[in-house]
């Protein structure tokens, strides 16, 4: 039987002659803080994602060896879904809640030191502490965009290239660790994870005593204002509340005055009776006249055609109306226009000119 030759191209086929003495298989990567990652992994690691972006804890930190000391490399990290499910926290355990959301465009975080010689990456562990996770799909700050309640794992890419523009044609290797799998959440679901974060995260020192943020509480106590200052601050509020009470009492007095002095409508004008109750009210959009705010209601609603004639006598003309005006007024009495209304001052029949007092009922 004939054996087919291996048609797979060797890894160094795309490499330049200077890369041949150092095959890529010699690169090794180990995860730093493995013990801490294992503590979280045994319970079920959770990572907070926010709109503005949140750093990871434990942070992604790796130790690299086997690089070419004088060759330049780029260190990249991306996050891929572990499965196609969405999860929920129910009765102290994670359960499948349904199908995963459509995968978002994959973003890759580039270490800020990239590109750098291999000697630079190998002299100390490579930390991706500035990497942030977000759930903002419109993020423009380069954060990693993830769905909440989904499981992800980070992948570490080591690319031999002089710059980002030549990454596509460069040789690279990908490394991942099962201990770094996590569930993205907007708030911690497992109380044990919360406790582990507080006990091990150096930025959570304020929460370590009885699970409270003692740093914030101490700061609040140190900035507590003195009683004198507190009284001074309350004075304006007391004044404002007193002013509101006086205004409220004033409004009540106005209402009482309106009710205590109802407008008497002459029996000779029966078509006003249906409008009597609404004559005291003004539309909500228009402010009440100044005369109504200052004292009892002195206005009532009357048909518009008599407005000009009535105002004419209010101006001080004490002469008797011409006969044609009286005839026009008598003609108006025979018509009813309840919707065509305006406001004029109310006067007693004793104060009216002689031409009005002699009108027939």
Curated annotation (Swiss-Prot):
InterPro entries: p53-like_TF_DNA-bd_sf, T-box_DNA-bd, T-box_sf, TF_T-box, TF_T-box_CS. Induction: By FGF-4, activin and retinoic acid. One of its GO terms (biological process) is positive regulation of DNA-templated transcription. It comes from the Eukaryota. PROSITE patterns: TBOX_1 (PS01283), TBOX_2 (PS01264), TBOX_3 (PS50252). Residues 280-290 have a biased composition (Low complexity). It is found in: Nucleus. Pfam families: T-box. Residues 36-209 bind DNA. One of its GO terms (cellular component) is chromatin. Keywords: Developmental protein, DNA-binding, Nucleus, Transcription, Transcription regulation. Residues 206-220, 234-259 have a biased composition (Basic and acidic residues). GO terms for molecular function: DNA-binding transcription factor activity, RNA polymerase II-specific; RNA polymerase II cis-regulatory region sequence-specific DNA binding. CDD domains: T-box_VegT-like. Residues 203-259, 280-323 are annotated as: Disordered. Gene3D superfamilies: Transcription factor, T-box. May be involved in regulating somitogenesis. This is T-box-containing protein TBX6L. It comes from Gallus gallus (Chicken). The lineage of its organism: Eukaryota, Metazoa, Chordata, Craniata, Vertebrata.
